[in-house]
Design a protein with these regions (language model features):
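H-loop/switch region of ABC-family ATPase nucleotide-binding domains
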Residues: 205-206
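The feature captures the beta-strand-to-loop junction immediately N-terminal to the Walker
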Residues: 38-40
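Helix-to-loop junction immediately C-terminal to a conserved catalytic motif
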Residues: 53
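Conserved beta-strand-loop-alpha-helix hinge in the C-terminal portion
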Residues: 225-249
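ABC ATPase NBD coupling module
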Residues: 69-83, 91, 113, 119, ...
Length: 260
């Protein structure tokens, strides 16, 4: 379970560029939840993810993950329990290393580091995991990751983030840079992995259809605050038009967030 207790974050405090990115946010995410998060650019969505993953410390409040206070825990220590995918398929992998070497690094998250002996020892584990992706990478373990397509690379990054089951998976617009067909495939794969492994998941999206289609709850953000929290029963009954209408009522709608 993730519990966020009254967190706030202000950047460039005391200057003309001062920006309150998170404003007294409180949130409880139950184990196994799949929450989609919508909001215009600058609403605080990625900043919320950054605060959870430890890219910076919040100014006030607490972040509790699986009954542990991680508020002041460095990002490299949080990475054992928190997996994250970004919009850019180039992030999250080492392009000059092979698929097998990348998986070896991911498999050692939170453990003592070694590479060559570890890779050979867990060859079968990696082959089976790649087969489960069903994108034809199981016979390409020696392929350099930098030669993969964007969709293949994002699917591999998803596997790397979940190879050792995390307490929490953060999906930060992870399909936005992919073509429509590949985006659908990666989204279905994300949903399947989250369900099969019972991984608590939070996903930022600008696609209203995806916000409704995936997950059991929707959060709407504006000006560093959560302004709406839509539960599963309400979400099931909503149409895209109703969700867009609810969003436009906040005065925050723009072309990008209305994509559907």
């Amino acid at each position: 379970m993730l519990k966020i207790d009254h967190i706030s974050k202000t950047f460039a405090k005391g200057t003309v560029n001062e920006k309150k990115a998170l404003d007294d946010i409180s949130l409880t995410v139950d184990t196994g939840d799949f929450i989609t998060i919508i909001g215009s650019n600058g609403a605080g969505k990625s900043t919320l993810f950054n605060s959870i993953s430890g890219e910076f410390f919040v100014d006030t409040g607490k972040i509790i993950l699986d009954d542990e206070d991680i508020t002041k825990k460095p990002d490299y220590l949080r990475s054992k329990d928190i997996g994250r995918l970004f919009q850019d398929p180039l992030r999250g992998t080492a392009p000059s290393m092979t698929i097998e070497e990348n998986l070896s690094l991911a498999y050692q998250r939170g453990k003592h580091f070694s590479l060559t002996p570890f890779t050979h020892k867990h060859h079968d584990v990696f082959v089976n995991a790649l087969k489960d992706l069903d994108i034809g990478l199981e016979d390409r373990l020696t392929t350099k990751v930098g030669t993969l397509s964007g969709g293949q690379r994002q699917a591999l990054t998803l596997l790397m983030a979940t190879l050792v089951k995390p307490q929490l998976l953060l999906l930060d617009e992870h399909t936005a840079a992919l073509d429509p067909a590949t985006s659908i495939k990666v989204m279905k794969l994300s949903e399947r992995i989250a369900k099969e492994h019972h991984i608590t998941t939070m996903m930022i999206t600008h696609d209203m259809e995806d916000a409704l289609k995936y997950g059991n709850r929707i959060l709407m953000m504006k000006d560093g605050k959560i302004i709406a929290d839509i539960d599963e029963e309400t979400k099931k009954k909503m149409t895209v038009e109703e969700l867009v209408r609810k969003f436009t009522e906040t005065g925050e709608a723009n072309d990008r967030v209305l994509l559907h």
